[in-house]
Every structure is written in structure tokens, then in C-alpha cells.
């Protein structure tokens, strides 16, 4: 079929060459910013749509239930030992609070994936900011745990208990304040937007309608990469290499070796859950900066990868309680007593469900001095 080379609308006739020139003018204009990703929004295809509409509600609901119950149990058990808990357990208490914040935003993520964002700008800003606060606080708390273990084991720093607890509480307060400050760009610039194609659902996104907002978005992205992930992971890696090296030399202190294992495992789980998301987000940042060859196909693949990797990262909020349950002897003992007191389960049924509980608890719980002891 041969298409006409002109468009006749009443008394106005547009030549196709003139139309192309007008489009080129508007695409180069600074008054009407256009993003290439708007023209690639349909590349995702039905796979991502099905994932958001079918798999995401089921999976996120499961994560919500497990994360809610698990982290509340962690908080209850740690709160019962408030006056005797160690510095690591204090950091883990705040980590559980941060994970609960992440759990609370999961229903909003499910709703947005199914029907779009229909809850207004205020909740849009709040949910995106809570997501960022959770991540920053989690990574900074894990870095503090690594530094605390490094100072206690490698340099044998043992401060006076009251002064030490005060410094830990001040550190945790500073971490929450830092998480809030790092999330300020989201609080200021997040808004509900309608994608270019009218068939798409409204989304809660970081607004990039002008140059100032775009610069704020890139600043937030690089702060997320460097301050929220890269630097804390470097600190954790440096500290735990030193800790492991010292523990290998002190083979006569098996209890100390067991006590630090939970911190390394928690950090490893955090890295495994969030590193794929950060790698994909970093590639997306490079693609938006035109540092790599951009195409609709690449944008589509990155969009799918971001959604899948974000799901893995969000699943992290329900994994820490499981880790404490299956690895911490004292934690298992306290959990067993709590569930028995609540009438949820008795010691016999728990031992049948987890055969290794009774054996490990009898042999090691008497020597356990910390909830995070293995």
C-alpha cells in the first residue's frame, strides 16, 4: 500500500518533510523535554505485564506475611532482652524495624502493578521515601555491625558498658537521620505521572520534567549506588576480612568464632539480594546518561530486569528472621519459649518439626551468651 506524502486537514496541507522538521525542532527544544524511554514503553511485552498482574500479588503477599510475622517476632524477642542484649543485637533490632518499613510498602507495590498508582501524591512520596530509608538504614546498620565486630575482635576494644550502649544508640539515631536525609530527593520530587502511551497505568515516579529535577534524579541515583551500596559493602568486606583473619589465628576461642558468624551471614544475604538490583540500576543509569548505546530493546530488557531484581531485593526483608531461627541457638530457644507461652506450639512439636533444634540447644545453649550465638 502506498501512503500519501501529504496530510490534508481542511485548508491546511502539511508536507511530510515539513512535518519531520517540526518534530525535529520540538525534540531538540529545551522547553519540551522528551525522553527516549517514552517511545520504548511497549517493548516490555506481555511477560512483564503478566508478572505484575499475576505473580507479583501472590509472591509479595507471601513476603508480606513472612516478613511481618518474622520481624515482629525478632523485635519481641530482642525487646525482652533489652537490658542484656549486645551491641550487635541492638543493631539487629533496628535492622528489623527497617525491614518492617519495607514490609509495609509491599501492598502499595502490588496495587501499583495491578491498577496503577491511584493513592495520590502524598502517599507516593511517602512510599518511595520509605523504600529508600529502608535500604540506606539496612546497609549502614550492617556496616556498623561489621565495624563493631572488627573493633571488638581485631583491636579488642571493650568500652564501659553504659558508655558503649549510649554510643550505639547515638549511632543508630544518626543512621535513621542519615536515611531520612538521603531520601529527601524522593520526598521533594516524587509524583504521580502518566506515561506517554495513554494505555499505560499511572505510576509513582521521580519527576524529571525539567533540568533541575533531572539533576536531582541523577544525584539521587549516584548517592544510592555509592553511599547506599558500594561504600558500605567495602567497609563490610574490609572489616570481615580482618575479623576472619584474626579468628583463624585464635582457634582456642570457638565461641567467639560462632558469635561473629551470624553477622557475616546477614551481610552475605543482604549482598546476594541487593547486588543484582544495583547492577541493573547502574546499567540503567548509564543508559540514561547515554554512556552506553541506547535502544528500545535495551530499555525493555532493563525494565524487565529491574522489576525482577527489585523483587529479589524486597524478598530480603523476610530472610533475616529465618536466618536467626535456623542459625542462632539462643534465638531458637527464646523463640521456642515465646511460641509455647503464646500457645502456638510446644517444645515437642517444634523438635519434631526441626529435628536439629533439641540436639543443638542442649549442647550449646548453656554456653550461649548472645541471641545471635550459633
Swiss-Prot record:
Superkingdom, natural source: Eukaryota
Gene Ontology MF: a single term: C-X-C chemokine receptor activity
Segments on the Cytoplasmic face: 79-90, 148-169, 243-261, 328-374
GO cellular component, one term: external side of plasma membrane
Subcellular location: Cell membrane
Membrane-spanning segments: 58-78, 91-111, 127-147, 170-190, 222-242, 262-282, 307-327
Disulfide bonds: 124-204
Annotated membrane topology: Multi-pass membrane protein
Known tissue expression: Mainly in spleen, in resting B-cells.
Residue spans, topological domain Extracellular: 1-57, 112-126, 191-221, 283-306
Glycosylation sites: 28, 198
GO biological process, one term: leukocyte chemotaxis
Keywords for this protein: B-cell activation, Cell membrane, Disulfide bond, G-protein coupled receptor, Glycoprotein, Membrane, Receptor, Transducer, Transmembrane, Transmembrane helix
Main localization (coarse): membrane
Keyword Transmembrane helix listed: yes
Function: Cytokine receptor that binds to B-lymphocyte chemoattractant (BLC). Involved in B-cell migration into B-cell follicles of spleen and Peyer patches but not into those of mesenteric or peripheral lymph nodes.
Assigned protein family: Belongs to the G-protein coupled receptor 1 family.
Protein name per its UniProtKB record: C-X-C chemokine receptor type 5
Organism taxonomic ancestry: Eukaryota, Metazoa, Chordata, Craniata, Vertebrata
Primary gene name: Cxcr5
Amino acid at each position: 500500500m502506498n501512503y500519501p506524502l501529504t496530510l490534508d486537514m481542511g485548508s491546511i496541507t502539511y508536507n511530510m518533510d515539513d512535518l519531520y522538521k517540526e518534530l525535529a525542532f520540538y525534540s531538540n527544544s529545551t522547553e519540551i523535554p522528551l525522553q527516549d524511554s517514552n517511545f520504548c514503553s511497549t517493548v516490555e511485552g506481555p511477560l512483564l505485564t503478566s508478572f505484575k498482574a499475576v505473580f507479583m500479588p501472590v509472591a509479595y503477599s507471601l513476603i508480606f506475611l513472612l516478613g511481618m510475622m518474622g520481624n515482629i517476632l525478632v523485635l519481641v524477642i530482642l525487646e525482652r532482652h533489652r537490658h542484656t542484649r549486645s551491641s550487635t543485637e541492638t543493631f539487629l533490632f533496628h535492622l528489623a524495624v527497617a525491614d518492617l518499613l519495607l514490609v509495609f510498602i509491599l501492598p502499595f507495590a502490588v496495587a501499583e502493578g495491578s491498577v496503577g498508582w491511584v493513592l495520590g501524591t502524598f502517599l507516593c512520596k511517602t512510599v518511595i521515601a520509605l523504600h529508600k530509608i529502608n535500604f540506606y538504614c539496612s546497609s549502614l546498620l550492617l556496616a556498623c555491625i561489621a565495624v563493631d565486630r572488627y573493633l571488638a575482635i581485631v583491636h579488642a576494644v571493650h568500652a564501659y558498658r553504659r558508655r558503649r550502649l549510649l554510643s550505639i544508640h547515638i549511632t543508630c539515631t544518626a543512621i535513621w537521620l542519615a536515611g531520612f536525609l538521603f531520601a529527601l530527593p524522593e520526598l521533594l520530587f516524587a509524583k504521580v505521572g502518566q506515561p506517554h502511551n495513554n494505555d499505560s497505568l499511572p505510576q509513582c515516579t521521580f519527576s524529571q520534567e525539567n533540568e533541575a529535577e533531572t539533576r536531582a534524579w541523577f544525584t539521587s541515583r549516584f548517592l544510592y549506588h555509592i553511599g547506599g551500596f558500594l561504600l558500605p559493602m567495602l567497609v563490610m568486606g574490609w572489616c570481615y576480612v580482618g575479623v576472619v583473619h584474626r579468628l583463624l589465628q585464635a582457634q582456642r576461642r570457638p565461641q567467639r568464632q560462632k558469635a561473629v558468624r551470624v553477622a557475616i551471614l546477614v551481610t552475605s544475604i543482604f549482598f546476594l539480594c541487593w547486588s543484582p538490583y544495583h547492577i541493573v540500576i547502574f546499567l540503567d543509569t548509564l543508559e540514561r546518561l547515554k554512556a552506553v548505546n541506547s535502544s528500545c530493546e535495551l530499555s525493555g530488557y532493563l525494565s524487565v530486569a529491574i522489576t525482577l531484581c527489585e523483587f529479589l531485593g524486597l524478598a530480603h526483608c523476610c530472610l533475616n528472621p529465618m536466618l536467626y531461627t535456623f542459625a542462632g541457638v539462643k534465638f531458637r530457644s527464646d523463640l521456642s519459649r515465646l511460641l509455647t507461652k503464646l500457645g502456638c506450639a510446644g517444645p515437642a512439636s517444634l523438635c519434631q518439626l526441626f529435628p536439629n533444634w533439641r540436639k543443638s540447644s542442649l549442647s550449646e545453649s548453656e554456653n550461649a551468651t548472645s541471641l545471635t550465638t550459633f
